[in-house]
């Protein structure tokens, strides 16, 4: 599951936070691909739901950070917090063509302002 661009309305710096599952033991390349899926999904969602904040993030250099959680349960706990805060986010599930089973939730993404 990937967690992407989220926004706190009081902060000044925008950044995208990608929350990646560490328990899946994905290769570095797989992690990079899942993070890219998360970033793209979140940016497209922000374009529709919060274009002004997306423009701000783009203008500030598109800062991104990747953090980890140790289970799918923890990932969905983070998603619940993002939803409660009104942050744009998306869940990324894998197609299962390479390293992990189809439908495995790998990360979440959100757009945030910190």
Language model segments and positions:
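Terminal signal-anchor or tail-anchor transmembrane helices
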Residues: 1-2
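Glycine- and Gly-Pro-enriched alpha-helical subdomains that act as flexible
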Residues: 6-49
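Solvent-exposed alpha-helices and their adjacent loops that cap or buttress functional pockets
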Residues: 8-12, 57-59, 98-102
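Compact, glycine-rich, soluble single-domain proteins
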Residues: 36, 41-64, 68-73, 84
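Mid-chain, well-packed structural core segment of small domains
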Residues: 61-101
């Amino acid at each position: 599951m990937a967690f992407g661009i989220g926004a706190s309305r009081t902060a000044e710096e925008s950044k995208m936070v990608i929350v990646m599952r560490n328990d899946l033991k994905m290769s570095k390349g797989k992690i990079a691909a899942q993070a890219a899926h998360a970033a793209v999904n979140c940016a497209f969602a922000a374009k529709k739901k919060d274009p002004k904040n997306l423009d701000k993030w783009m203008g500030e250099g598109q800062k991104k950070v990747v953090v980890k959680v140790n289970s799918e349960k923890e990932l969905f706990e983070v998603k619940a917090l993002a939803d409660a805060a009104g942050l744009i986010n998306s869940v990324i599930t894998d197609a299962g063509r390479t390293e992990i089973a189809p439908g495995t939730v790998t990360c979440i993404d959100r757009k945030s302002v910190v």
